[in-house]
Design a protein with these regions (language model features):
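Domain-length accessory/inserted modules outside core catalytic folds
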Residues: 1-111, 115-184
Length: 184
């Protein structure tokens, strides 16, 4: 339902599609960036540094439904990346129509969403392990692939899954969802 809603017309320029949103939310969960409560929502609808809600979700019921779908998606992703073994499989943007637009290539939208989340905080890589730095560098590389990448969807998905797995193993919190749950 969320994927279809994000694919509809009427969103502001710069809003996220479902693959970009997944990458964005995974970054918030696997690499918590210390974003103030709720401040992570506006980038989803294309908000540029403010809380101006687009007409598409301006009605209170529509906004509540949108927020609930996004938070529900985030909870689903958290369950997938927290499971042992991990059940996370990256969603690649296969529904996009191929064009000259680089964001239509597999994994690029996802990786760009991940990087968009990281840009919300200036913590950088300074206190991260070498493995985490390498994982983020791999994701950044996918966001910048040339227009004709020599990699398959399966290779991109495997690389994203591996990078996320590395980051999840080191996370201290679940970002907007709070402290990690202790399971005995």
């Amino acid at each position: 339902m969320l994927a279809a809603w994000l694919a509809e017309a009427g969103w502001p320029r710069g809003h996220m599609d479902i693959a970009t949103l997944e990458g964005y939310l995974i970054a918030l969960l696997a690499w918590p960036v210390g974003v103030p409560a709720g401040a992570w929502l506006p980038p989803i609808w294309g908000g540029q540094g403010g809380w101006k809600v687009p007409a598409k979700i301006a009605a209170p019921d529509a906004y509540t439904k949108f927020a609930a779908l996004v938070v529900g998606f985030m909870h689903d992703l958290d369950r997938e990346i927290s499971a042992r073994p991990s059940r996370f499989e990256p969603m690649l943007s296969r529904t996009e129509v191929p064009s000259w637009d680089r964001s239509s290539l597999s994994g690029i939208s996802w990786a760009q969403g991940f990087l968009r989340a990281l840009q919300q905080n200036s913590q950088g890589l300074t206190w991260r392990t070498e493995g985490a730095r390498i994982a983020v560098t791999r994701i950044a590389h996918l966001a910048c692939l040339p227009a004709t990448p020599p990699v398959s969807d399966l290779d991109v998905a495997a690389d994203l899954k591996s990078a996320v797995s590395t980051l999840v193993a080191e996370r201290a919190t679940r970002g907007p969802l709070g402290a990690l749950l202790v399971v005995d």
